[in-house]
C-alpha cells in the first residue's frame, strides 16, 4: 500500500515529474485520513500525482469488513476527496461471484461513480485464482476456496449496471 510510505512516494513522484513522467498512485485507500497532519502530507503527494487508481472492494460496510478486515469509510472518503479536489481517478472493482457481484453492491458503486466529478474510468476486474499457488506454498487455507471465476456474461452484466461506457471512453 503506497499510502503507508507517503513521504517516499511523494519524493519518487516528484523525481518522476521532473523527468516528465506521468505518475499514477494505485491504492486501496484504506489508510486515508482527514487528520490534519495526514492531509498535509497527502496534499503534497497529490501535487505530484496525475492519476489515482482506487480499488473499492465493497460498498456495504459489513461486506467490506468481512472481505478485508477493514472499514470502507476511509476509501469512500478518499473517493470524495479526489472528486472534490479535482484529482483524476479510476475506480476498480474486483468482481467475485457470490460476494461483490450482487445487484445491490453494483448499484451502490454505480451511484457513487455518478457523483464523482473526476472519474475517468470504471473498471470491472474479474476475480481469478492465479495466485492460489502462493497460498498453497505457505500452507495457508485459501479464504475464497471454491469460488468460481466470473463468466463473460457476469462481467458484461456488472459493466452494464455500473454504466462503465460512460467513463471508459474519456
Where are these regions (language model features)?
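A structural motif corresponding to the C-terminal lobe/cap of the Radical SAM core domain
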Residues: 111-114, 120, 136-161
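Class I S-adenosyl-L-methionine
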Residues: 129-137
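Conserved AdoMet/S-adenosylmethionine-binding subsite of the radical SAM
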Residues: 2-125, 130
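Glycine-centered secondary-structure boundary/capping sites
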Residues: 69-72, 136-141, 166
Amino acid at each position: 500500500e503506497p499510502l503507508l510510505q507517503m513521504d517516499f512516494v511523494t519524493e519518487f513522484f516528484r523525481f518522476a515529474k521532473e523527468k516528465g513522467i506521468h505518475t499514477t498512485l494505485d491504492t486501496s485507500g484504506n489508510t486515508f485520513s482527514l487528520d490534519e497532519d495526514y492531509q498535509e502530507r497527502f496534499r503534497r503527494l497529490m501535487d505530484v500525482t496525475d492519476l489515482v487508481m482506487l480499488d473499492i472492494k465493497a460498498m456495504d460496510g459489513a461486506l467490506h469488513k468481512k472481505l478485508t478486515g477493514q472499514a470502507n469509510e476511509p476509501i469512500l472518503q478518499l473517493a470524495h476527496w479526489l472528486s472534490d479536489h479535482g484529482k483524476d481517478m479510476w475506480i476498480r472493482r474486483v468482481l467475485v461471484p457470490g460476494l461483490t457481484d450482487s445487484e445491490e453492491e453494483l448499484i451502490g458503486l454505480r451511484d457513487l461513480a455518478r457523483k464523482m466529478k473526476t472519474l475517468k474510468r470504471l473498471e470491472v476486474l474479474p476475480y481469478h485464482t492465479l495466485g492460489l499457488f502462493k497460498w498453497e506454498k505457505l500452507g495457508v487455507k485459501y479464504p475464497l476456496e471454491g469460488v468460481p471465476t466470473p463468466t463473460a456474461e457476469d462481467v458484461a452484466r456488472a459493466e452494464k449496471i455500473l454504466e462503465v461506457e460512460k467513463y471508459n471512453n474519456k
